[in-house]
């Protein structure tokens, strides 16, 4: 069962930035009668040019805790913080810190929050193995680094003694330009789909971002259920000395955001050609 968010590719408020971001998302939770919402969460805040994903750590289920409640509250609080900042530009680190401070349920979660600044730069914070990639001209130009202590043990926000605080977050700034495509996702995508296939499935930008997110998520699910496909997680497992083949069945959240030339107040497209 898939949960398609409302596509937010509608025109945004005029801004001084040379670029703007239009985003859509698709979520495929693992099939579970006990936890039908899964353990992933996300938000899209178009007016603030900000998106975020979180992945609740499933090991909490062994203690009777639904980590999805943690990730959902974390993203809800992050969006609320972003909205409170929107007038002066969103600081993703503040959004993450505010979200952590306001999340008061048991559990832990990875998290990634990203905003497009007024100078056309992606500013992001990332904790754990969720993250984002920038697709440019048919290939992955940049991918956020994974934070983990060992194979399949990512950094994670939480209150437990084994959990992390927002200060551990990687702080990332990357210049983007019109035509770039941001793919933000939980590890349900990146564990299963190679970078080359991500870029191929993104295509040339003809489809709405929510449709591209759906395509990526469904491909990840297909690979996740395979036992003989060479996958990123299988490669990483073997590097760690663990025999592993095929994909990893998991919740899958994908947000796709198109970077576009922004229009000024008169409707004129503002394009910085550089030098």
Range-by-range predicted roles:
Residues 1-275:
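PP2C/PPM-type serine/threonine phosphatase catalytic domain
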